[in-house]
């Protein structure tokens, strides 16, 4: 029990990133009275899939990239995991930490005519610190991170109690895509957490943590990790659901906000005044910084590894932090808007990979099943990404909108992926023992 709870809280802390706190309030603000169904969709991809990803990694003893290389193709592994580390690194996740900490912690205290200059100055300091600590690893960063996660959780608990005791306002009717498709909209909103990608990148930590507790037998490691994941599911589900309720009660009084950072900051001010905003700013700022340091270091380490050392760690780190600085200054709302099409196109590939790897024994690990299912997923997920970017292919878009179920809600890949897997399984049944080269 002790090992299960310890690892469960560790898994929770991995995914309990300050940057992800902005999404449930924004989703619920727009979903209004439909927010419960939207939250279920969000939890499916924001919590369920990452924890399935962890289980998939535990199942193969941490050797997940080797499984992908063997089942699909070496180049597929190189390209997809290269994109994964870019997404959770300098493309989106790292600049988002700088943008979120500015939006929540600094913007509320700046005069309007100094907003742009303030953002440039703050993010410069933020990413200089990111580079310095990532280039010079220190236990101080780990210690600060371990302290701040419980402090942030405690602050949010106080905020949640206040919200449930005396909500800011009434819940309004849904708007935009949440009127007709709250679950599907919440499902794709969950992509923005990028926690499935993070799970596949750092999932080996869960195995290491269990082994460090003295559990060495593979079956016992597997059981402990699954139980720990259930602990993390309960904690994360409670936090995200409470954040969603907070967001749903805000627009009737505070109006509609452009992003979740504004909602959190405004709600904190309503309940606790400037003192509350200062506390939240401090906690979020340092929590985002520790996340930025860890993820930037992981990105640089991965690309140094796959390049066989031809790309130096510090050069990669410098490039990542400079790019993150530029991207963060686009602003949080714009950064999220740009990331959506990329994630809508990329996420389905990893969803299919994780589900197939969990069901691997059912079709004897057939490479054909993997290749057909992913091969059918890829073109349709790209089409979904183009639609999310409002750049649909003429003719093709209209055809898919008419004849492909779920395409209108950016889930057009789902049935083709299932069809590819079924065809692969049936082919194997008719050709026992066949494996493609």
Where are these regions (language model features)?
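Extracellular/periplasmic helix-exit of transmembrane alpha-helices
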Residues: 234-263
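Helix-loop-helix connectors at the membrane interface of multi-pass transporters/channels
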Residues: 27, 99-118, 211-212, 292-319
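Membrane-water interface regions at transmembrane-helix termini and the short interhelical loops
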Residues: 59-67, 126-148, 212-215, 325-338, ...
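A generic transmembrane alpha-helix motif of multi-pass inner-membrane proteins
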Residues: 166, 366-437
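Hydrophobic alpha-helical segments and their helix-loop junctions in multi-pass secondary transporters
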Residues: 90, 94, 153-178, 196-197, ...
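Select transmembrane alpha-helical segments in multipass membrane proteins
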Residues: 2-11, 36, 74-87, 120-125, ...
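Membrane-interface loop-to-helix entry segments
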Residues: 133-163, 339-351, 370-380
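Hydrophobic, membrane-embedded alpha-helices of multi-pass small-molecule transporters
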Residues: 6-16, 161-169, 178-243, 279-291, ...
């Amino acid at each position: 029990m002790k090992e299960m709870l310890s690892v469960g809280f560790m898994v929770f802390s991995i995914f309990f990133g300050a940057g992800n706190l902005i999404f449930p309030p924004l989703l619920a603000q727009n979903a209004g009275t439909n927010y419960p169904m939207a939250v279920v969709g969000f939890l499916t991809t924001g919590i369920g899939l990452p924890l399935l990803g962890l289980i998939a990694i535990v199942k193969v003893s941490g050797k997940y990239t080797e499984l992908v290389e063997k089942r699909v193709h070496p180049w597929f592994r190189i390209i997809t995991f290269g994109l994964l580390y870019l997404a959770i690194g300098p493309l989106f996740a790292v600049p988002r930490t700088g943008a979120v900490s500015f939006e929540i912690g600094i913007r509320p205290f700046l005069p309007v005519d100094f907003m742009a200059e303030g953002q440039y100055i703050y993010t410069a300091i933020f990413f200089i610190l990111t580079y310095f600590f990532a280039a010079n690893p220190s236990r101080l960063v780990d210690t600060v991170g371990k302290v701040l996660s419980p402090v942030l959780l405690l602050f949010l608990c106080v905020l949640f109690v206040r919200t449930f005791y005396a909500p800011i306002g009434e819940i309004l009717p849904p708007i935009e895509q949440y009127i007709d498709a709250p679950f599907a909209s919440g499902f794709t909103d969950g992509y923005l957490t990028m926690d499935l990608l993070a799970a596949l990148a750092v999932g080996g930590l869960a195995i290491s943590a269990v082994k460090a507790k003295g559990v060495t037998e593979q079956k016992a490691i597997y059981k402990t990790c699954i139980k720990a994941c259930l602990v993390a599911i309960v904690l994360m589900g409670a936090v995200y659901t409470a954040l969603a309720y907070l967001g749903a009660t805000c627009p009737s009084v505070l109006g509609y906000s452009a992003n979740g950072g504004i909602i959190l900051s405004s709600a904190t001010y309503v309940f606790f005044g400037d003192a509350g905003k200062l506390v939240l700013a401090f906690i979020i700022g340092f929590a985002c910084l520790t996340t930025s340091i860890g993820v930037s270091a992981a990105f640089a380490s991965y690309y140094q590894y796959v390049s066989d050392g031809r790309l130096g760690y510090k050069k990669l780190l410098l490039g990542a932090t400079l790019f993150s600085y530029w991207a963060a200054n686009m602003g949080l709302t714009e950064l999220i808007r740009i990331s959506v099409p990329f994630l809508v196109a990329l996420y389905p590939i990893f969803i299919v990979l994780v589900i197939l790897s969990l069901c691997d024994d059912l079709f004897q690990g057939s490479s054909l099943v993997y290749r057909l299912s992913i091969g059918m997923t890829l073109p349709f997920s790209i089409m979904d990404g183009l639609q999310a970017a409002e750049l649909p292919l003429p003719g093709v878009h209209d055809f898919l909108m008419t004849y492909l179920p779920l395409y209108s809600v950016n889930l057009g890949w789902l049935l083709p992926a299932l069809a590819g897997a079924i065809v692969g399984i049936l082919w194997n049944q008719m050709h026992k023992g066949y494996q493609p080269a």
